[in-house]
Amino acid sequence: MTLLNVSDLSHHYAHGGFSGKHQHQAVLNNVSLALKSGETVALLGRSGCGKSTLARLLVGLESPSQGNISWRGEPLAKLNRAQRKAFRRDIQMVFQDSISAVNPRKTVREILREPMRHLLSLKKAEQLARASEMLKAVDLDDSVLDKRPPQLSGGQLQRVCLARALAVEPKLLILDEAVSNLDLVLQAGVIRLLKKLQQQFGTACLFITHDLRLVERFCQRVMVMDNGQIVETQVVGDKLTFSSDAGRVLQNAVLPAFPVRRRTTEKV
């Protein structure tokens, strides 16, 4: 089943020039894509190529300048109030900048309960039980429930944001560089959790990343973005190779996971 369909999407931002006239900076140009239930897809590209802007459009935080976005066959622009609430529950996003994604005055307990209060019909006790369950799933415990964001490390806060998104059991989870910043052990744990969710609920995942290792370990398909356009799409197999210049540049930039000791024949 197709969850999300994007056709001919373009987007620009207006900014003032020296003449006082508004100039338009194109960020996305004729982007088309589709995501199916249970699918894991990567959107791969360098910083500044338009990946995060596309993500904001997909979750409805901004409206595109041109083109269409449909959720389960319904255009986002035509969703009624009830449908929009269901859409906000079904599609969740975890941002790269976790500090800006939470209220620093709220406790972790309040942060986790917030989407459940607004999007689910759960009693308070059920919300608290699910909050504990989600924390455990991302390798945190109840000791952080009464802490506030400034009291957490960056990795802990990122996992809190992931737990918050998972608490409403979304149909599609968009992760904007949200896993790449975790260390390899935590990253592996999160990936195991996401695989489990896919098996249980058919959750689809869209990884927005520049981390090719993450793509090769977890994704079934990868789209390469460059200068606001998707320049190629590849199925991820045993040997992932790219035909576009942008894809090859990213592939050549990958460093080994561990340092390689060079042998030397020089005598001291």
From Swiss-Prot:
The keyword Cell inner membrane applies. Gene3D superfamilies: P-loop containing nucleotide triphosphate hydrolases. It holds the Pfam family ABC_tran. The gene is nikE. Belongs to the ABC transporter superfamily. Nickel importer (TC 3.A.1.5.3) family. The lineage of its organism: Bacteria, Pseudomonadati, Pseudomonadota, Gammaproteobacteria, Enterobacterales. Residues 4-252 form the ABC transporter domain. Part of the ABC transporter complex NikABCDE involved in nickel import. Responsible for energy coupling to the transport system. This is Nickel import ATP-binding protein NikE. ATP binds at G45, R46, S47, G48, C49, G50, K51, S52. It catalyses: Ni(2+)(out) + ATP + H2O = Ni(2+)(in) + ADP + phosphate + H(+). One of its GO terms (molecular function) is nickel cation binding. The complex is composed of two ATP-binding proteins (NikD and NikE), two transmembrane proteins (NikB and NikC) and a solute-binding protein (NikA). It is an enzyme of class 7 (translocase). Its EC number is 7.2.2.11. It is a peripheral membrane protein. SUPFAM superfamilies: P-loop containing nucleoside triphosphate hydrolases (SSF52540). One of its GO terms (cellular component) is plasma membrane. InterPro entries: AAA+_ATPase, ABC_transp_ATP-bind, ABC_transporter-like_ATP-bd, ABC_transporter-like_CS, Nickel_NikE, P-loop_NTPase.
